[in-house]
Amino acid sequence: MRLRTEVRDLWATADSQEVRVGDARILVRELSADSLDFVVTSPPYWNILHKEDHKAKQERVSHDLDTRYSDHKHDLGNIPKYETFLYELASILGACGKALKPKKYMAVIVSDFRDKSRFVLFHADLAHALEPYGFEMRGLSVLYQRHKRIFPYGYPYAYVPNIHHQFILILQNVKK
């Protein structure tokens, strides 16, 4: 469904995809060393679906979609502290570096978000967190989400802009 919404013009050319279900910490270890030419992923955004006042949660409820993927303590969406979440996510994506061939690329699709009044620069935090794993930023693209509606957050007391885009981090595996 998401592919049809985000890249509907390209949907006709998508042949097949392999989907593996499980804990990414375990699944990534099953990949053979230097076996991948490209990695693309869109990881969870911390625990934003748990927040009562979050628009994404309200939207998911209105469409009868899950707002909690699991109650498992290892679920990234259940980690209460952002710093711990970022560390865990970086370690999972960093482990992809073993399977990704040298000098090949990983694209990570993320969105910045708000945690109450704090604006979290998730894309920048994640890019920095991946540097110790041998991933260097090579580019940043913006994915405009033209299907999202505009909401007057904070009006008339504050300016709170909507987030109508995601970032695509283009990272290169610089291991030799």
Show where each model-derived region lies.
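Class I S-adenosyl-L-methionine-dependent methyltransferase catalytic core
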Residues: 1-176
